[in-house]
């Protein structure tokens, strides 16, 4: 039998979490993401709404975002509305109808935003079939074309 003290267990747990969180931040971004975000950040306030635990500001692209809201901060998970309500608080004078939410999950992103009156774009790089009863939004798979697509759709 192997026994550890509570302080040893805490050290082990912290070490394990640090390994996990460091691995969690070993992400390779899709081609064109950085350029698209740089371009969009010149004209729009950008934010991250995530159910995950990666910190956008640990990445080079973090500099393009004005805010990031995790489930920890929202005290909830998408598709519930807490992330979106908090986003409203981050940008003065904006309403849901003036927002655009870009996401890859049909329920947690598209449905969640759509039901609040937020415009949506679906990142569909796997050419997935639309499986929802509500109308499929415009979709894209090439980040290099995103700024032009947004300009055409919403300007």
For each feature predicted by the language model, list its residue ranges:
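Short, acidic loop-to-helix structural element flanking the phosphoryl-transfer center
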Residues: 9-10, 18-48
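Hydrophobic side chains within well-formed alpha-helices
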Residues: 12-16, 61
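Asp-based, Mg2+/Mn2+-dependent phosphohydrolase catalytic module
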Residues: 34, 38, 44-155
């Amino acid at each position: 039998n192997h026994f550890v003290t509570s302080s040893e267990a805490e050290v082990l747990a912290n070490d394990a979490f640090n390994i996990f969180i460091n691995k969690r931040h070993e992400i390779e971004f899709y081609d064109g993401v950085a350029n698209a975000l740089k371009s969009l950040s010149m004209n729009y306030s950008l934010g991250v709404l995530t159910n995950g635990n990666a910190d956008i500001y640990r990445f080079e692209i973090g500099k393009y975002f004005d805010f990031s809201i995790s489930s920890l901060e929202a005290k909830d998970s998408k598709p519930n509305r807490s992330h979106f309500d908090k986003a409203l608080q981050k940008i003065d004078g904006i309403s849901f109808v003036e927002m655009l939410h870009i996401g890859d999950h049909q329920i947690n992103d598209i449905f969640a935003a759509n039901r609040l009156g937020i415009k949506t774009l679906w990142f569909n790089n796997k050419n997935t079939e639309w499986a929802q009863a509500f109308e499929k939004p415009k979709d894209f798979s090439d980040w290099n074309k995103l700024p032009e697509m947004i300009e055409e759709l919403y300007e």
